[in-house]
């Protein structure tokens, strides 16, 4: 058949599966996508029109210019009867789009169980992967919270512990979304509760990252290990970060809102009740994208809570047995970080008022305002870094050294005069005046580090 012949037949409405472009009401040829009348009928779930087109000789496997079949469109809408009509007419359940997307993946994403069952009964491949990310139908079901679809797919041979090209699993998809029913369905189907992402992150930590605290408790109840730290830190460390991220200073980027009934403080108790070590030491630095100046190697959850002056968590961890005097590998104490050592102005969480209260708490616990860490930083360096006048005066009243010079060659006065990390030079004129009046001195200002 020549192109000109097709044009004539189109004008007469005589090509099976195609209709006149002008007949908008009857399921037309889409000149952009080249959808056929069969595509339109499948998309609407219009079984009568679908059957009429097939009876007229329409090819059940015809694709539009994007490689999409009528079967995939029927699966998108969850039109079970239309799916069965197409399969009976010979539609290929494994015909994939250009990106490797199969009808079963589409049906799993939509979540209609009968659609999935119909495809599987006609030979749909449950382990097929799309070519972009290497995802399977089971992953799509998990990512869309379709717990009812999990069992049929796994029973048909879907890989419950399969991984995407980047190492994500169905369980991790469901955990990231916090859907307990889907997580339970995957675990009941054989998903490995102790699996990790390639960097060692456990499902428990993924739940905590996303503030899915109800799910975190559920994972603990099912046997998740609260001491797991293959990625370099535990769920308890993660909870401190999730509760008060670096960008929380001015509430422009608030913490994730917990989903469900379990609060973050209740989760702290649950983690410890299930065996979490309140004095666990961090072994790696996270690549979380937040600006951080503290060496977190050897940091405990308590030290991290002190860094963001989260007094509620600090006190709770103390009640649960935390040692408040443990330091990081630089010898930086909880009092030092609470005072402001390693803060990033306007981004580090916590107010100056909270910092003062936290410093007083640490003094009650035996920490000292005269401690100097291995970087030469003192509590007074920290209080000036965070611009806390009342805190600075309190520290001086308690005996803090006025003009100690750290390893960078900075005294507290140097910082008040505007020398700071990287390309950030923030000056604190009021503190500069206070320090000068008390006799503070400053060494010659060094070049800013490159």
What spans do the regions from the language model cover?
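Ankyrin-repeat-protein effector appendages
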Residues: 21-37, 189, 222, 241, ...
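Start-of-repeat signature of ankyrin repeats
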Residues: 34, 67, 100, 133-134, ...
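Ankyrin repeat boundary/linker residues
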Residues: 31, 64, 97, 130-131, ...
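N-terminal segments that cap or nucleate solenoid repeat domains
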Residues: 27-66, 70
